[in-house]
């Protein structure tokens, strides 16, 4: 297992109140056109990390809508090299290269296939002047299964989701603050009080039992739900190596997580998506369920 330590170049007041949140830039699957492909910003009071970037320059519009500037982005985790996750990364890198006054470095994290795809594309399509800036400003970190690394005040551990379609990494992130388990116990021991707040991102394919240790009992689980189980004959999730809101709810209950975030959905039921996906997941899961819209902020 390798280990990478990267410190966010931002001022941090140790006495400031911690604020952890996710901003969903997109919540849709690969072929959506009314909403954006699934990607999000994970941030604390002092650290910001972009996770995936969707399938095109729509990422620039989504970032602008939530008031995140290119100059704010110094960490980018890419789960896998499918079009709806990696092509927006090319635009982010291009904008970093041509951003006047960009300070510091952009750290891009991903597996070997992700690194190969990104580097191949930028080498083929960016101008020499832009490539020179990429060499100055962008650092590529090739990750292996189980690698641990720090992004500012977040401690991450990545894991291979064992996809049969495309090599893909999810991650477990320890965030500032303490786990909800601590608040639930009035007689918590000192060891338990130190238990961190943990989020797990499972990528965009079904859970594999090999990764239980990364996800079991986490405070927040981010999980794909391609459609409702009730609509499985229409959207064919299982044939596409995806799962449903019902499956996600069962998984969350089985793993003992506290909060469930569903994403990477179809877009034909947007008017009822939040209500119906929540209801279906709640048939088995007793914790809190979030079915966010694009640009929605979830406080962790």
Positions of PLM-derived features:
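Conserved beta-strand hairpin/beta-sheet module of binuclear metal-dependent hydrolase folds
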Residues: 6, 17-66, 168-181, 186, ...
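Short histidine/acidic/glycine/proline-rich micro-motifs that form metal-
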Residues: 29-30, 83, 108, 112-115, ...
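Metallo-beta-lactamase
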Residues: 106, 111-168, 176-180, 186, ...
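Cap/insert and terminal regions of metallo-dependent hydrolase folds
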Residues: 186-192, 196, 206-295
């Amino acid at each position: 297992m390798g280990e990478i330590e990267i410190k966010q170049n931002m001022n941090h007041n140790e006495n400031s109140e911690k604020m952890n949140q996710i901003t969903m830039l997109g919540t849709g699957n690969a072929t959506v056109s009314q909403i954006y492909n699934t990607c999000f910003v994970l941030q604390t009071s002092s650290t910001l990390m972009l996770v995936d970037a969707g399938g095109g320059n729509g990422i620039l519009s989504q970032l602008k809508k939530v008031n995140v500037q290119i100059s704010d982005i110094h960490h980018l985790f890419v789960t896998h090299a499918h079009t709806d996750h990696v092509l927006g990364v090319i635009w982010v890198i291009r904008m970093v290269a041509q951003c006047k006054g960009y300070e510091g470095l952009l750290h891009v994290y991903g597996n070997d296939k992700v690194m190969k795809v990104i580097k191949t594309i930028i080498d083929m399509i960016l101008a020499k002047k832009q490539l020179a800036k990429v060499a100055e400003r962008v650092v590529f970190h090739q990750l292996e299964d189980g690698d641990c690394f720090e992004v500012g005040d977040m401690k991450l551990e990545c894991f291979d989701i064992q996809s049969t379609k495309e090599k893909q990494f999810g991650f477990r992130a320890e965030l500032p603050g303490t786990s909800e388990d601590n608040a639930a116990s009035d007689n918590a021991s000192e060891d338990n009080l130190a238990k961190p707040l943990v989020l797990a991102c499972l990528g965009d394919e079904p859970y594999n039992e090999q990764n239980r240790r990364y996800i079991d009992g986490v405070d927040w689980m981010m999980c794909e739900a391609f459609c409702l189980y009730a609509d499985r004959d229409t959207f064919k999730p299982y044939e596409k190596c995806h799962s449903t809101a019902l499956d996600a709810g069962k998984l969350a209950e089985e793993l003992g997580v506290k909060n469930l975030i569903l994403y990477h959905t179809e877009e034909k039921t947007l008017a009822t998506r939040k209500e119906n996906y929540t209801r279906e997941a709640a048939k088995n899961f007793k914790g809190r369920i979030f079915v966010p819209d694009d640009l929605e902020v979830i406080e962790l």
